[in-house]
Amino acid sequence: QVFEKQFKKLNPGHEGEYLQVFKDIKKELNDDDLGRGFYNRLKSVSPVKLIDFENIKNNVFHFTAEFTCKNGQDEFRPDITLFVNGLPLCFVEVKKPNNHGGMVAESSRMNRERFPNKKFRRFINITQLMIFSNNMEYDALGGIVPIQGAFYCTGARSSAPFNCFREDNISQQKIAPFHQDYVYKDIN
């Protein structure tokens, strides 16, 4: 419903193509290309666009908890799924601080169970960013193994490394420009 409405809004003169584009996307998501076909469609603006990158306010953003990704008997439910114009483009897995196994367990689950499972291919192909956090300071054993903190990865066939979110202070200022310009607000 959201996808259809946004497609028609962003593509005047192409409203009648909505259903065919939707079918094409569903087909592309089953391809064994790590989502390359879908990504190319996503960033394209011709002949139709799925996201308005020029005017972000023309897009609709939603999120939900425990969105089920199911194919046959196989399923997984990311803790949080983020949607842009009705497309589930990002998911977030959040763990309790000091959870057993830390982020190593989550990395293993993704790399051993989800990425290699062909039934999950369509979900991995549409997901542009995966975020994992246990709301703790970084500990990555010298950058080798993600133990705790917030990490991200993108789709893979069998194994994707977890990467740290870092804002470099290239100018060596007392307060990094990112933190100065975008002050974090207390959520308590």
Protein language model regions, located:
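An alpha-helical interface "stripe"
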Residues: Q1-N188
